[in-house]
Amino acid sequence: MTEQNQQPKTYCGFIAIVGRPNVGKSTLLNKILGQKISITSRKAQTTRHRIVGIHTEDQYQAIYVDTPGLHIEEKRAINRLMNRAASSAIGDVDLIIFVVEGTKWTDDDEMVLNKLRSAKAPVVLAINKVDNIKEKDELLPHITELSQKFDFAEILPISAQRGKNVHILQKIVRKSLREGVHHFPEEYVTDRSQRFMASEIIREKLMRFTGEELPYSVTVEIEQFKLNERGTYEINGLILVEREGQKKMVIGAKGQKIKTIGMEARADMERLFDNKVHLELWVKVKAGWADDERALRSLGYMDE
C-alpha cells in the first residue's frame, strides 16, 4: 500500500463532565460543541439526563457525558436517580473534567471529589467563572490549596460563558483520546432524538421564565412530534407540575407566561431543527411524580 492510500489515524474517547449543581457544566459543554445541546439556566439541578455531546474535529472525536450535578441530599426518588446517573458516568471514561466555581469550595464539591478518588481516569480540574472573581489575587492561593487535595492531571481556570481557556481544555481532551474508530458520523453533535431535545428546550424556558419560583420537580412530556403535509413539525408538549399553585405560576396572568415560554421554545427549536415548528403547550398537575420511581420510569428518567 502506498503512503498516499493510507488512512490517517483516528482517535476517539469518552469524557465525563462532573461537578455539583450550577457550576456551569452545561454551559461548558455547549461552548465546546458550538451550539446548545444541554439545558442551561441559573437554577440548580436543570440537567436531568446524561446528555451525550459529540465533538468531531479532523481525526479526533470526543464524546462528552454531561452528568446531573452530584449533590448530597437524596431524599426524593429523582435526586437518588440523578446521583446514580452522575456516578455511573465516571465509571468508564478516558478523562474526567471536574468543574468547580471560582474560589468557592462547598461540602458538595468535597463529596464529588471523594467520588472521584476511586476513578481510574485522569481528572482535570476546571475552575469556572473566574471572570466573576472580584479579588483576583485570591485565585492563585485557591489553586494551590486545591492542588493539595488531589493529584489532578491539570488545573485550569476557565470561563465557559466567555470561552476563556476552553480551547486549552479541548487540547487536553485531545491528548486523552485513544487511537480508534469514531463512534458517530462527523456531523453528529448529540445522540439524543429531536423529540428529547424539544422537551429539554421547553424545560429550559420554564426554568428561565419562572426564576426561583418553580421547583426543579417539573418535567415536560412530548405527546406528539410529527411532520405535517406542509413540512412543519407539529409538537405538543405536556408540562407536569406537582401542585395547582405551580400550574398557575407556569400559565401566568392571562396566560402570558406560558405564551412567552412557548414563543421562546419554538424559536430555539426552529434554529436547532432548521425547520418550521408549530408548538402547543398544556400544563397538568401530577402530584408526587418526583417521589415515585414508577412515574420516573414512565417519563424516561430511568432505564427499565
Curated annotation (Swiss-Prot):
Q: How does this protein lie in the membrane?
A: Peripheral membrane protein
Q: How does it assemble?
A: Monomer.
Q: Where is this region: G1?
A: 19-26
User: Main role?
Assistant: An essential GTPase that binds both GDP and GTP, with rapid nucleotide exchange. Plays a role in 16S rRNA processing and 30S ribosomal subunit biogenesis and possibly also in cell cycle regulation and energy metabolism.
Gene Ontology MF: a single term: GTP binding
Organism classification, top ranks? Bacteria, Pseudomonadati, Pseudomonadota, Gammaproteobacteria, Pasteurellales
Q: Give the protein name, as stated in the record.
A: GTPase Era
Instruction: Tell me the GO BP annotations in alphabetical order.
Output: ribosomal small subunit assembly
**Annotated segments matching region G4:** 128-131
Which portions of this protein are annotated as coiled-coil regions? none
